[in-house]
């Protein structure tokens, strides 16, 4: 399994213990970009939420960097994996800088207080995508 960074084996996903999709087998190598394509209601988000432990697996296994996902703590997983789903997060009173800073939360303590180093990393990330000038703007006021 070591050739895959993320791999599923006979994965079954669904709700309340009932499999809606089963026999899901795939592997993703480090650096690959993968998209799930299908009609509305086909289970794309359910698969993603199951892989990221937002939903309980109905069956099968997920391996992350050759380790079963069930053996990885939520804190460790959140520092190694990020997922963008279609649901909008509630961003009232948040600036663009605040949104970028949420990517640092897995590295903070329980209160989520950013250190000077965290702030430096957030600033570097915004500079990398030329977004410094919108850092203090209301996130809801910028265009998608």
Question: Positions of the model-derived regions?
Answer:
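Conserved ABC ATPase "signature" region
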Residues: 101, 116-135
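Short coil-to-beta microelement around the adenine-binding A-loop and adjacent beta1/P-loop entry
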Residues: 18-19, 75
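The feature captures the beta-strand-to-loop junction immediately N-terminal to the Walker
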Residues: 37-39
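Conserved ABC transporter NBD signature motif
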Residues: 60-68, 77
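Conserved structural motif at the start of ABC-family nucleotide-binding domains
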Residues: 6, 21-23, 135
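Helix-to-loop junction immediately C-terminal to a conserved catalytic motif
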Residues: 52
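Conserved ABC ATPase signature
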Residues: 112-114, 138-144
């Amino acid at each position: 399994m070591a050739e895959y960074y993320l791999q599923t084996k006979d994965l079954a996903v669904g709700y309340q213990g009932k499999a809606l999709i089963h026999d899901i087998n795939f592997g993703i190598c480090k650096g690959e970009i993968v998209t799930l394509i299908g009609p509305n209601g086909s289970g794309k988000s359910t698969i993603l939420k199951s892989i990221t432990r937002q939903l309980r697996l109905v069956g099968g296994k997920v391996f992350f960097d050759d380790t079963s996902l069930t053996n990885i703590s939520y804190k460790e997983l959140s520092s190694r994996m990020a997922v963008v789903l279609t649901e909008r997060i509630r961003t009232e009173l948040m600036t663009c800088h605040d949104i970028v800073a949420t990517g640092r939360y897995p590295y903070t303590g329980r209160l989520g207080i950013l250190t000077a180093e965290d702030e430096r990393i957030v600033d570097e990330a915004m500079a990398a995508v030329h977004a410094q000038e919108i850092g203090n703007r209301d996130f809801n006021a910028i265009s998608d």
